[in-house]
Amino acid sequence: MSSEVEPPQKKKQPWLPDYIVENCLAHISRSYYPKLSLVSSPFALSSYPKSSTKRDIASTTEEYFFHVCLQLPKSPLPTWYTLWIKPDQIEKKKKINTFTGNTRLVQIPSSYHYPFDQVFIFNLYGAMRSSKAMVRPPSYGLVSMF
C-alpha cells in the first residue's frame, strides 16, 4: 500500500511595506515607469500621484521628457510614445535648460496607460484642452500629451 504524500507548500515571501517601496521608487526616474509597470501591477496602480510627492520629499531631480499619444493612419488604435531626452544630454546654464538635440521618440509598451484625467489634448494648431471634460479618448488627428 502506498501512502500519498502531500507536496510541501511553498511559503510566500513577505512583501516589503509600501512606504519602503515608495521611498525606493522615488529615486527612480519617471522615464523608467513604463518598464516597471510591466513587471509590477501594484507599481502601475500607485505610480500617480503619490510618486511625485515622494520625489519632492526625496529632492530627486528629474530629466525632461514628454509623452504623446498618436493615432497614425495605418494603426487602428492610438499608441503612446515618449520623447526621450537622456539626463546627460541636458546642460543647465543660468537655470535655463538647453538640449543638445539628441532625442528619440520611443514607443511605450501598450500595457502602460496614463490616468485619462492627467492627459491634455492638443489639436494640430496647438490649442490645448483638458481631457477631464472628455468622455472618450481623442479621435484621429489629435495629439495627446502630458
Curated annotation (Swiss-Prot):
This is Uncharacterized protein At4g39750. InterPro entries: F-box/kelch-repeat_ARATH (IPR050354).
